Amino acid sequence: MRAWLVIAVAVLGVRDLAAQAGQAPERTVTSVSFRGNHAIDALTLGAAIATSASSWTYRVPLLKHLGLGQRRLFDELEFRRDVVRLQILYRLHGFFEARVDTSVARTAGTVDVVFRIDEGPPVLVDSIVVRGVDSVLDARRLRGRMPLSEGKPFDRVEFDASADTVATALGNRGYPFASVFRNYTVDRAARTAAADYEAVPGPRARIGDIVVGGNQAVSAKIVGRSLAVRDGDWFSQDALYDSQRSLYQTDLFRYVSVGIAEDSTVAGADSLVRIRVQVNEGPRSRVRAGAGYGTIDCFRAQTTFSTANFLGNGLRLDLAGKVSKLGVGSPTDWGLSNSICSALSGDPFSERINYLASATFTQPAVFGRRSTLTQTDFAERRSEYKAFERNGVGSSLAASFGLGRFSLLTLSYRLTYGSTTADTAVYCVYFDRCEQQAIDVLKERHRQAALSLSLTRNTANSPIEPTAGSVVSVELSHASPLVGSERLISYNKAVAEGSWYWQLERGWVVALRLRGGVIRPGVAFVVDTSIRFVPPEERFYAGGPASVRGFGRNEMGPLVYVADTVLVDSATGANEPVNLRISPVGSYAIGLANFELRMPSPVWGSRLRLAAFVDAGELWDQTAAGLIPSGLKVTPGVGLRVGTPLGPVRLDVAYNDYPRQRGPLYEVIRTSSGAPQELRLVQSDYPGPPRGTAFFQRLQFQFSVGEAY
């Protein structure tokens, strides 16, 4: 009778609260904040309660009346429940003595809510005992892998996850039916907790047979090649996950499930289990098309046709076509270099559209489950901003081998036949003099072949906006007549790059990148002149939105200046070039370091992010005496990122206090008809056009899509 009376009083109390809430005037929640929280961040606390602030766009009158904001009303009953929700959340995380107080500032139509939290001392894990695994696992090492650890707050989520860790470890040792019973005791007075796990491994089992279902055009043999398990193997839960991942990576299936079949034992034998692979095939063919805009591409478009299981045996065919420089390059020169594509004005390598047409054949599981063989045939015209234009056809063959879960080893061979055109003045730098006959030889079509070996390890948690993990790669390349290249194009090249990401707290990320590379050319003879020639497309360039952001694209390294006319100041004797253009030469070695702190914006934090960064870089030129450094350059800056489905749209502003790069100044000598005939060296160490001294004149703006690294 007493119990029914208590329930009745509680129900009537809730009804009275609900009635009061219904009679109260509507008030808009303008802000919700937390004070005193340290163990749990505000974002997690906010997700655990019902009361939330209206969007900032709703609080701006103009945007509010345009219907862009979202209004959230204050609910008195839910607000009181939020106090209980927060107390329960803290108990789950080991803070049994946490207290929550509230402060509400009310006006006629709005409320501002503050939750004041006194977390109190946590209950700490005093001991963790794991029983039943001594004959199978090392209990001490197992405890080190468990999320719950001694000396830390007793977190119920980590307590449950630790039981899953024990079960998974047993499953990977061949025990598919392992059970883990868990219990804990809490001493509130001593503020300690003891966790106890009792494992029952069950029988150890091997794979009896593998059944594939749901496949239609793709044969069971092709499915089997991607599996990490075989008949007779000891059962492993990780191997099942790995098999599922490998099948998805083939691009043949839209759904894959790999697990123990319902009739999990084979012929009633506990020591054998049946694995069922259930798949749902994806579309046989896909067509994708897209268009976009970039500051150094102007308008661009691309289309891809892919067909899976081409000619059977799991082979995939990808046909791709890409074009860029639309609107500025012939035959689509619509005069946009004078308006929205003004960055390309004066770039001689943007006068024709760039294109790529390619056909790629990909065969998975050729040399093993984690291997892929890829052949690509292509024709292209591509250019690097103010540096060069490449025209050619070619083919590449690459064999990739997965090493563990995160690493990939690739051996590739690339053979091309084409020409690379750079500014004539750049070739003059190569020869240390301007001989048209020798320059014409370098501009001719040449056969270029390179053998490359690369190793990549990727543990980043996102390919678009990583917040943890790293991406490290090393690539070695060799080109010489030994592998099919012409003698003119002979070099050894090594490049290493690493990016690391750490999350300081929710939304705050530190990103670091280091990159280094060196290329050593062989000796060739051109018109009886000894030269160490490296094709412009193989050289190192720095400066731009993904490099040292205080410099324009490719403008940090050695430069060549070319003017239509060079006047001489009668008073100072200084050269005054007319219609000056700048051409990057490229370098033989590079060293880059980028440090960036990424943080949420105080307004519209779900879409806007801020960044503060420091970029540093140095390039080395090759001389007879060896590599000569150009000097370390360091440029700090800040940035704004706007989140989009394709990745963040990025605007960076960097400060550059360095004078312009010094380099040779050439004047174009023309014939009587006005056609360019040759170049004349005017000054071997021209300091470049003067840079403004005002603060804003030393700012370099960079606009791009996607993080810098």
Sequence positions of predicted segments:
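Sec-dependent N-terminal signal peptides
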Residues: 4-12
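Sec/Tat signal peptide C-region and signal peptidase I cleavage site
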Residues: 15-19
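Periplasmic polypeptide-binding modules associated with outer-membrane biogenesis and secretion
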Residues: 20-299, 304, 318-336, 344-355, ...
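Conserved helix-loop functional segments at active or binding sites
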Residues: 148, 212, 229, 249, ...
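Repeated loop/turn-to-beta-strand initiation elements of outer-membrane beta-barrel proteins
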Residues: 254-256, 285-287, 298, 310-317, ...
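C-terminal outer-membrane beta-barrel translocator/porin domains of Gram-negative envelope proteins
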Residues: 273-274, 286-288, 292-299, 306, ...
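Transmembrane beta-barrel wall of Gram-negative outer-membrane proteins
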Residues: 346-440
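A short, conserved beta-to-alpha structural element at the edge of catalytic cores
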Residues: 633-658
